[in-house]
Structures are given as structure tokens and as C-alpha cells.
């Protein structure tokens, strides 16, 4: 009884409760695929231009292509059509429901609610679960709010928040008993609905999440926001999300994400994007996370065939990294719709898995085939992946570029990483810690920096990469390096490590001399580039460039050197010069190990590998005689025994 009372209290005050989460969103559950759904005939106007038969037909088509989860949107002004009346000189008089009397205190249109229940019934009949985006006030670059609130900032205006809370409570109360609903989403990218400080955004999220939990404490509250930052002062930040919400979401579109759309869509940088960002959000917050919106942004960015190929690699990556669900944006093309935002912007019109007349695109086929492939495996869920290193990020900066750069370098080096906030309550145990692309003059607090270095004293290895004018105190003490001169001057040099040569670009020159450190490699100017220093019982490996933020993926030998210094040895390792292979290792309770190998190259590849163990079986590829063969943008699962 005490536990029930406590959970009720936590739910009532709007703070995220710890505990079990729906398997679609957490590591260890069966992987779900799906999409974001607007009806094929009307898009966002599906509720006002209702066609029940078309909705049934749409959902049948989606279910036939293996989709078991949809994100759906009650368009806010259609469901809560409140209006305002004004008197002399524009003085506000009162609110009305669609210009008439209120039919319920929340001003909710019951005809729209009936249509939403029909959607729920149709989904349940087909085994589809729904993530419901409650405050759908922003969609595809257009604001959609009730007429009475059109000139307000709906994130900060007290009247707007009052009506939002009323709407959410009414909607959740009326639909919470439907079995098709898996989770409540705050809404679609609600941080795009108005300007707000981090504190104001906290208040808004608190109000909406509290309203949800007052009516339904049994389902998780999902973020749905557009980008979450490590930077504590950002509107939507990791600490705020962790405190208030149950499940994190990513919208990993390369076109809109820094350092992503700088390579072809069907290559490694973009193939890793969804898994990398989703793992980052989960690790930063300690909450489950899933890819809620993914997509190519249409045939103007990537052909339909290449989009499908990249999706296939992303699906394998997300599944291998313990991400519970992957949803594409969106179900159907919207190229025949003549209202805004489709009247405004061409890039939003051709994003569907299906054409507007219902023809399946290669992406729909790839989604179906991946889900079918998982069904052929002798296990329903994949054991958690092995993690070798912790990348330590800071709340003093927006760390996305560093996080992504570290992920790509680690993938190419053949190791697996997780993330942690330097200012967090705990620092996970690991043989290797990475302080990537240390920036500015005060990225890590004194306490955070020494907490990492204390791990080196105790026997771990710490990799520090530093460039672009950054200053770290105690550099000489912790790395065995002395700074002779450090000044702003464009600098391009070459480095060779273990026979692999690559270039680095920096905005500054940092001239170093070894003062206890061992120089493992110098750059082409003769300056120490890669060094190692014995520190306590452990080691500090240092590289004199910010390789993570500058998208210098060819510098992966730096990460391999640090992994070797930490004594990390994987069961399957790539041995060749080509590094477009991702490997994750998963130990089962019966002693077997499964290795998921993802080929991020847009062509079939035969990789040279070292295998420590006996290959008992391979699915969707071949692994024999030191060669691993995988199709273009595809994945292979290997079962090993030792």
C-alpha cells in the first residue's frame, strides 16, 4: 500500500517516476517499427475532413508492412476550438467554444474525440499501439493553435497554459482506458511553439506532464521535443528532461542536425546518426529513449532506394544498441495537399513510406523486411551490448558534435562507448574514459575534471583530445606535457599512427614538449601529437587536436591506441584499413555471444576480421576464414562460442 501511495504522489506532482517502462521504449524489449501517421487523404486536416474508411485502409496497409507502433496527433485547434470575444477598443470579454457556448469545461469537441476513439479501435484490431502527441500545436513548420490563442506564446502565457492543461486532462481522462494507447507524448516538437527560457520550458513541461499523470499514472510520458542539449541553459536540456519525463525521444534528421548532412545519406555518418543520438539522450538522462521521427527529408536529399538502404543500416544500429523502437516520418506523401505548410514548403511533401495514392516505396519494404528478418531469429530480444568506454560530456556546452564524433571514431576503432555527464551524480565504471575535444577555458569544473583523473589514478585509462584554443589546467601534471606556446593561427598538419596517416585541422597552434610523457606520434611539423603518460596506477593518453568536433573520422587510430592502452580486446575486430564496419557484442545467459555487424558502406563489403572464438552460425551474411561478408548498408548477426 505504501508503494502505491508513493507512486500516486509522484505522479500527481509531475515528477517522472522511476521503474518499469513499456518494452517498446526500453532496452530488453522486442524491437518495434512504425511511423508517424496522418491520414493519406487529408494529412493534418484528417479530423475535420474525416474519412473512416480511408483511415481503416491506411492502418491495414501499415500493419501489413510490419508496423506495430504509430505516433498520432489530435490537431489542437480541431479538438479544442476555443475562440475569444472582444468589446470596446478590443477589450477581452470571454472565451467561447467554436463561437458558441461551452459543451464541456475544457472546450473539447466531442465529435473529434469520437473520431479519435475510432482510430484507436482500428489500431487495436490490427495489433498497432499508439503514441499520442497531445499538444499538436506545431507541425511541419506551421503553428496550429486554437483561434483564441493564436497571438499568444503558448509556452509561457498563463491563459494558454490553463487551456492546455484543461485539454490534456479531458483528453487523457476520456481515452485512457483504450488498450491501443501505449504512451502519452507531450506533443509534436512543442519547444518550437514559442520562445522560452530553460526555466519557462521546465514550468511548461511540468504543467503538461502533471496534467497527464493526474488522469493516468499507468503510462509513460514521452518527450516528443525537437532536440535536447547537454547545455543546462538551453530551452530543452538533459537535466530538465530527466527530472520531468519518463521516455526520451530523438528526431534524427541529418539535414537539420549539425555535422550530419556533410556526407551522402547512405554512408556511415548518417547510418549511425539515429543510434548515436538516441543512446546519448538515454545516457544523459538515465531514461529509455527511442527514435521517434527519422527520415531522409525526401527525394531532393536522397533517392528513395538510397534512403531505404540507409534506413536498413540505421535499423540494425538501433536494434543492436538497445533502442526499443524506430519510427519513420511519415506514413504517406502529402504532395496533393494545398494548405499550409504544404503550400509553403516543398521539402515537407514527399516524406512518406507510401505515395499519396498508397504505393509502397522502398523504405516501406525495407521496414517490413527488417521486422520480418527479426522474426526469423531464434531469440526474440537481443542481450545488452558490451560497453568499453565512457565519453564524459559537460553541461557547460552543447556537446552534440563531440558526442557524435566520439561515436564515429569509436566505431571505426572497433570499440563501443556510452556517455555520462561530468556533472552527473555518478560516473560509470569503465576501463577507458574519454574527454573529447576539450573546448574553451572552463569546460569541466574542477570537481568534474579530477573525478575523471581519479579513475586514472585507480587504474583506468583516460583519453584527452584538445584543440581549437582550449585550455585545461593541470595539463602538465596529468599528461606529462609542457605547453611552450599556444596561439591562434590556422594549422593543418599530418599524423601517422601505426602506419595509418591522416590530416588534422585546427584554429590554433599548441607547441608541446614532453615532460614525462612518452611521444607515440608527432605531426609533420615535429610537434608531439599523440602521447601516453603513466598517472597513478593508470594512464593518460593525449592527442593534440579536437578530432571529434572537426569531423575527422580518419583519426580513428587515436581511439584504437587508447583502447589498447586500456587493455580492451574485443571478440571480433576489423583488421583492414577500411573502417565502415560497426560491431556490437552481446553476451547471452547460456554462454553464447552474439555479434551484430553493420556495414555502413553503400556497397557489398568483405571485411578482414580477427575472430576470438568459433563461429557457430551467421544470419544475413557470412563469416569464415577471417573474412566477414555483408551486403550494402546491411547487417549480419554472428553467434560465437569460446
Each language-model region and where it sits:
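Aromatic-rich peripheral "rim/lid" segments of glycoside hydrolase catalytic domains that contact
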Residues: 331-388, 405
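Aromatic-Pro/Gly-enriched surface loop or interdomain linker
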Residues: 365-432, 589, 632
Amino acid at each position: 500500500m505504501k508503494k502505491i501511495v508513493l507512486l500516486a504522489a509522484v505522479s500527481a506532482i509531475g515528477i517522472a517516476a522511476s521503474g518499469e517502462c513499456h518494452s517498446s521504449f526500453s532496452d530488453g524489449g522486442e524491437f518495434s517499427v512504425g511511423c508517424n501517421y496522418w491520414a493519406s487523404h487529408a494529412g493534418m486536416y484528417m479530423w475535420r475532413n474525416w474519412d473512416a474508411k480511408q483511415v481503416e485502409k491506411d492502418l491495414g496497409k501499415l500493419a501489413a508492412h510490419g508496423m506495430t507502433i504509430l505516433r498520432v496527433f489530435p490537431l489542437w485547434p480541431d479538438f479544442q476550438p476555443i475562440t475569444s470575444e472582444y468589446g470596446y477598443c478590443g477589450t477581452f470579454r470571454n472565451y467561447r467554444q467554436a463561437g458558441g457556448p461551452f459543451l464541456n469545461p475544457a472546450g473539447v469537441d466531442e465529435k473529434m474525440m469520437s473520431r479519435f476513439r475510432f482510430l484507436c479501435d482500428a489500431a487495436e484490431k490490427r495489433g498497432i499501439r499508439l503514441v499520442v502527441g497531445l499538444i499538436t500545436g506545431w507541425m511541419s513548420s506551421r503553428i496550429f493553435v486554437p483561434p483564441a490563442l493564436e497571438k499568444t506564446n503558448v509556452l509561457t502565457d498563463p491563459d494558454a497554459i490553463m487551456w492546455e492543461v484543461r485539454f490534456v486532462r479531458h483528453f487523457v481522462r476520456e481515452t485512457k482506458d483504450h488498450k491501443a494507447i501505449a504512451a502519452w507524448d507531450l506533443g509534436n516538437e512543442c519547444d518550437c511553439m514559442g520562445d522560452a527560457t530553460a526555466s519557462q520550458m521546465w514550468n511548461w513541461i511540468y504543467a503538461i506532464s502533471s496534467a497527464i499523470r493526474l488522469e493516468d499514472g499507468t503510462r509513460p510520458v514521452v518527450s516528443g521535443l525537437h532536440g535536447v542539449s547537454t547545455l543546462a541553459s538551453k530551452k530543452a536540456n538533459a537535466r530538465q528532461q530527466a527530472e520531468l519525463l519518463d521516455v526520451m525521444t530523438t528526431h534524427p534528421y541529418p539535414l537539420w542536425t549539425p555535422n550530419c548532412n556533410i556526407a551522402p545519406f547512405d554512408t556511415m555518418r548518417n547510418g549511425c546518426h539515429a543510434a548515436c543520438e538516441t543512446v546519448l539522450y538515454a545516457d544523459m538522462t538515465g531514461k529509455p529513449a527511442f527514435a521517434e521521427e527519422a527520415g531522409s527529408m525526401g527525394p531532393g536529399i536522397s533517392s528513395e532506394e538510397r534512403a531505404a538502404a540507409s534506413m536498413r543500416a540505421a535499423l540494425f544500429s538501433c536494434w543492436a544498441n538497445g533502442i526499443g523502437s524506430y519510427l519513420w516520418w511519415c506514413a504517406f506523401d502529402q504532395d496533393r495537399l494545398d494548405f499550409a505548410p504544404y503550400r509553403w514548403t516543398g521539402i515537407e511533401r514527399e516524406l512518406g513510406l507510401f505515395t499519396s495514392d498508397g504505393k509502397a516505396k522502398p523504405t516501406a519494404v525495407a521496414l517490413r523486411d527488417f521486422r520480418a528478418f527479426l522474426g526469423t531469429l531464434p531469440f526474440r530480444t537481443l542481450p545488452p551490448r558490451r560497453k568499453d568506454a565512457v565519453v564524459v560530456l559537460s553541461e557547460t556546452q552543447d556537446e552534440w558534435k563531440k558526442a557524435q564524433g566520439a561515436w564515429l571514431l569509436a566505431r571505426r576503432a572497433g570499440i563501443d562507448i556510452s556517455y555520462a555527464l561530468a556533472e552527473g551524480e555518478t560516473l560509470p565504471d569503465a576501463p577507458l574514459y574519454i574527454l573529447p575535444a576539450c573546448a574553451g577555458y572552463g569546460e569541466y569544473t574542477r570537481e568534474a575534471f579530477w573525478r575523471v583523473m581519479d579513475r586514472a589514478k585507480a587504474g583506468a585509462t583516460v583519453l584527452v583530445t584538445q584543440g581549437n584554443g582550449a585550455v585545461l589546467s593541470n595539463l602538465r601534471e596529468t599528461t606529462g606535457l609542457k605547453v611552450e606556446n599556444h596561439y591562434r593561427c590556422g594549422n593543418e598538419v599530418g599524423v601517422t599512427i601505426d602506419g595509418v596517416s591522416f590530416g588534422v585541422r585546427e584554429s590554433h597552434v599548441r607547441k608541446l614538449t614532453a615532460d614525462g610523457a612518452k611521444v607515440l606520434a608527432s605531426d609533420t611539423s615535429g610537434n608531439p601529437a599523440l602521447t601516453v603518460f603513466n598517472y597513478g596506477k593508470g594512464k593518460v593518453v593525449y592527442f593534440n587536436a579536437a578530432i571529434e568536433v572537426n569531423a575527422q573520422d580518419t583519426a580513428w587510430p587515436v581511439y584504437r591506441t587508447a583502447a589498447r592502452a586500456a587493455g580492451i580486446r574485443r571478440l571480433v575486430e576489423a583488421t583492414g584499413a577500411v573502417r565502415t564496419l560497426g560491431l556490437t557484442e552481446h553476451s547471452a545467459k547460456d554462454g553464447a555471444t552474439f555479434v551484430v555487424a553493420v556495414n555502413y558502406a553503400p556497397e557489398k563489403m568483405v571485411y578482414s576480421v580477427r575472430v576470438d572464438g568459433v563461429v557457430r552460425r551467421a544470419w544475413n551474411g557470412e563469416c569464415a576464414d577471417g573474412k566477414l561478408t555483408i551486403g550494402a548498408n546491411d547487417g549480419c548477426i554472428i553467434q560465437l562460442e569460446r
